[in-house]
């Protein structure tokens, strides 16, 4: 179906707004994936706070101009599915990576975070805010317990030397 100028401008504006508010973006090619599988992906994307859209490459190039995702322009070849993550930078990378494992024809073309092209593996392994805090607290707790044990051992040794 041919798009008129107003429709094209609306698509560019919509994608541009999504890009400006997003933490990260992933580009993929979904040729050969069944409609049923794509519907499942879209549903799980919505639940994860990920905005997904299939957009013509020329419109996508215009939409990302002046955003952090301008670096992805070289990946806009063939059918392009773009996903913006609004809540966690690794959310859509994790989602796409899992989907690509189950669907051989789904190909991840690229990803961007903070204006730079990133490896999808890097983004997929980023911890969520809660996971990062839990890791930090675990490290601090472990360090404090170890330091306390060493302090008691040093105190015990000092008392034994004095006796």
Curated annotation (Swiss-Prot):
CDD domains: Ribosomal_L10 (cd05797). One of its GO terms (molecular function) is large ribosomal subunit rRNA binding. One of its GO terms (biological process) is translation. Gene3D superfamilies: 3.30.70.1730, 6.10.250.2350. HAMAP family: Ribosomal_uL10. It comes from the Bacteria. Coiled coil: none annotated. NCBIfam families: PRK00099.1-1. Belongs to the universal ribosomal protein uL10 family. Part of the ribosomal stalk of the 50S ribosomal subunit. The N-terminus interacts with L11 and the large rRNA to form the base of the stalk. The C-terminus forms an elongated spine to which L12 dimers bind in a sequential fashion forming a multimeric L10(L12)X complex. Forms part of the ribosomal stalk, playing a central role in the interaction of the ribosome with GTP-bound translation factors. One of its GO terms (cellular component) is cytosolic large ribosomal subunit. Pfam families: Ribosomal_L10. The gene is rplJ. This is Large ribosomal subunit protein uL10. Keywords: Ribonucleoprotein, Ribosomal protein, RNA-binding, rRNA-binding. InterPro entries: Ribosomal_uL10, Ribosomal_uL10-like_sf, Ribosomal_uL10_bac, Ribosomal_uL10_bac_type, Ribosomal_uL10_CS_bac. PANTHER family: 39S RIBOSOMAL PROTEIN L10, MITOCHONDRIAL.
């Amino acid at each position: 179906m041919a798009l008129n100028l107003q429709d094209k401008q609306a698509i560019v504006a919509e994608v541009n707004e999504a890009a400006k508010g997003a933490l990260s973006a992933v580009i993929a090619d979904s040729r050969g994936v069944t409609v049923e599988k794509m519907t499942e992906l879209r549903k799980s994307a919505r639940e994860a706070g990920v905005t997904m859209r299939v957009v013509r490459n020329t419109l996508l190039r215009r939409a990302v101009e002046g955003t952090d995702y301008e670096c992805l322009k070289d990946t806009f070849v063939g059918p392009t599915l773009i996903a913006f993550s609004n809540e966690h930078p690794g959310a859509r990378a994790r989602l796409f990576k899992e989907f690509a494992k189950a669907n051989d024809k789904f190909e991840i073309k690229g990803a961007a975070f903070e204006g730079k092209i990133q490896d999808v593996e890097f983004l997929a392994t980023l911890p969520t805010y809660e996971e990062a805090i839990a890791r930090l607290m675990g490290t601090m707790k472990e360090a404090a317990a170890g330091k306390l044990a060493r302090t008691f051992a040093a105190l015990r040794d000092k008392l034994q030397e004095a006796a």
